[in-house]
Amino acid sequence: MSTMAERDSDVSEPSRSRPRLGLRRGRGGGGRGRGGRGGGGGDKGGRPPIGLLPLIVIAIALVATGIGAIIVSTSYDTPREAKVLGPNLAINDGASNPLDLSANNSPALVRNPREAGNLVVANRIDSPAYSCSLHVSFDGGGRWTQTPIPAPRGEEPKCFAPDAVFGSDGTLYVSYVTLKGRANAPNAVWLSRSPDGGKTLSAPVRTPLGAKAFQVRLTADPTAAKRIYLTYLKADELGLYTFSNTGNPIMAVRSDDGGTNWTDATRVSGPSRQRVVAPSPAIGKGSELNVLYLDLGDDVLDYGGGHRGRGGAPYDGRWQLVLARSTDRGATWRESVVDDAVVPTERFIVFTPPFPSLAVDRDSGTAYAAFQDGRDGDADVRLWSLRSGAGEWSEPVRVNDTRTGDGTAQYLPKLAVAPNGRLDVVYYDRRADRTNVLNEVSLQASFDEGKTFLPRVRLSDRAFSSRIGFGVERDLADLGSRLGLLSTDDRAYAIWTDTRNGSVRTAKQDIARSVVGFNDPPRLSSASETALRVGGALLILLGIGTLVLALARRRAAARKAA
């Protein structure tokens, strides 16, 4: 905060000498001057008249008060900052074991609303065999232990696509898919519960989703302790790297008793949408269920497996980003198009697409959507927002602070909203590698509802290759479908798939984490700041005007006395 030194000013009156006129004063006092008794009026003509000095004091006080108001308005301009707290930490047990070649990816990160230090991460493992992993911390992410996920009886031991969420009563729910056969097709979706923050899991219960339920996601209503939702893509026939038919819908089911009983499935995506993928659910301010997904339009390259599972140039058409919303707990749905001109930036296997991210500010009701987009010539992170009660989504905001069209990719964003309204975005970032291969992980934060963002904070303390993972031999290395992010008023907890301990040969992937701390100094409201600055300026002008008036009166009095 700046300081102001006060200066004491002496306002002195220059002495004025009037020439004597040579009149001699008689005894009777007839020679009195006009200024009063004893002929002293000639000397008094240069003194300030009564009321002049108070005007000068008032003028100085007004100017000083105005300057003080402006200083107060600027004293709250301390810049907000974000800083990484400590080194990266691997979450999975086998990260430091060179014999453990597990490909861990697609992490989900959740927090117990009843115990702030209780964090849980669920992730899938693609190789050397399909499986799932659950990691639990009770000290805010400092130490992690692994909890075994129980295998359902009668199913092949191939767990896939786990997800996790805490209910408002602190119950942890974990969903996962079991795969079947040489094609590794989804056979069933299961749900386990934990009453102790993830230390133990109950025997799994089969959900009604059935076989060929892809891209399953789990969410919970924070206002109803046992209300949970599952969203998924209901597929028909499968082929190699493809759904054999179009028209596979996105569906949703609800349980109001923690997964014991379920509603009938309802269709989320409209019947005219023939190629939809990657449903991402989130609960809104009024407990409405929101589902963000991609409509691939005519993209048969990815949806139809036209690339035959090999990397190369992305689809050259456009996708739509769509939000479906239900205000009656999933019974009926209304859609809004977030953006109808999303430019694809990569190829993908349709069974495991990159997911867009959705977050809702439960205080303001604003919904935020994020995804990568190539309209500027390379992959950039874009953000869209929909204010509560608004009919249309905002124009996209480019989040990453790289030079436009620099040829590097920023992609797979994950959003989170802190209780104080701060919006955080974490994403993979190749800005430091002109060959566009090595990843870093970056986080950017917005304090004005996504209009502007702080400069990026690098979370990963080492760059790592984006070409390590399952599918690398086909130039389609899979780092997973998402990153994980949690936000509190003064922290952000981020997790991602990290390949620094792997190689093209081993395909080893680990789950790494980082913590970011924020300083959020007290701020004046924009109205208060404007009032102080405008009011201060007016006081300064008024003080200057008063001083000018005082000086003018002094000069006038001096001329009159002369």
Residue spans for each PLM region:
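Extracellular, repeat-based ectodomains that mediate carbohydrate processing or recognition
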Residues: 48-562
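Terminal targeting segments of Actinobacterial cell-envelope proteins
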Residues: 2-50, 555-562
